[in-house]
Amino acid sequence: MADEEEDPTFEEENEEIGGGAEGGQGKRKRLFSKELRCMMYGFGDDQNPYTESVDILEDLVIEFITEMTHKAMSIGRQGRVQVEDIVFLIRKDPRKFARVKDLLTMNEELKRARKAFDEANYGS
């Protein structure tokens, strides 16, 4: 009889703690669903993946970004996260480090191309 009384209480506590895909955030607006669906399809998933899969992946992405941001804030200057802080955090993960280097290089190339295009169009 005591066990029967504990089970409903346990379930209620579990729901309050936030067990499940929401990760304690309750029902929140999904920010990256469209992009994640496209990425999942690009990596070989179905064109219309299960909503639950997209939601779980989004929770993982947001958790990763949040943790990285908190770590970057703790090692860098107060109140600012800089690119160097992120690079420092991922320096021991070769795949992430290489990808960030590639993205930073492409960003610089795009900046130079835009500058050259603007100079050609508007003449300096």
Swiss-Prot record:
Predominant location: nucleus
GO molecular function: DNA binding; protein heterodimerization activity; RNA polymerase II general transcription initiation factor activity; TBP-class protein binding
Domain of life: Eukaryota
InterPro entries cross-referenced by the UniProt entry: Histone-fold, TFIID_TAF13
Any one Gene Ontology BP term: positive regulation of transcription initiation by RNA polymerase II
Entry-linked Gene3D superfamilies: Histone, subunit A
Ranges of compositional bias, category Acidic residues: 1-16
Region (Disordered): 1-28
Positions of the Histone-fold domain: 31-74
The keyword Transcription regulation belongs to this UniProt entry's keyword annotation: yes
Location within or outside the cell: Nucleus
Alphabetically ordered keywords of this record: Disease variant, Intellectual disability, Nucleus, Transcription, Transcription regulation
GO cellular component, one term: nucleolus
The keyword Transcription is annotated on this UniProt entry: yes
Record annotation: effect of changing residue 31 to H: In MRT60; impairs interaction with TAF11
UniProt disease annotation: Intellectual developmental disorder, autosomal recessive 60: A disorder characterized by significantly below average general intellectual functioning associated with impairments in adaptive behavior and manifested during the developmental period. MRT60 patients display mild intellectual disability, delayed psychomotor development, learning difficulties, and poor overall growth with variable microcephaly.
Subunit comment: Component of the TFIID basal transcription factor complex, composed of TATA-box-binding protein TBP, and a number of TBP-associated factors (TAFs), including TAF1, TAF2, TAF3, TAF4, TAF5, TAF6, TAF7, TAF8, TAF9, TAF10, TAF11, TAF12 and TAF13. Interacts with TBP, and more strongly with TAF10 and TAF11.
Family per similarity comment: Belongs to the TAF13 family.
Domain remark from Swiss-Prot or TrEMBL: The binding of TAF10 and TAF11 requires distinct domains of TAF13.
Protein function: The TFIID basal transcription factor complex plays a major role in the initiation of RNA polymerase II (Pol II)-dependent transcription. TFIID recognizes and binds promoters via its subunit TBP, a TATA-box-binding protein, and promotes assembly of the pre-initiation complex (PIC). The TFIID complex consists of TBP and TBP-associated factors (TAFs), including TAF1, TAF2, TAF3, TAF4, TAF5, TAF6, TAF7, TAF8, TAF9, TAF10, TAF11, TAF12 and TAF13. TAF13, together with TAF11 and TBP, play key roles during promoter binding by the TFIID and TFIIA transcription factor complexes.
Name the UniProt record assigns to this protein: Transcription initiation factor TFIID subunit 13
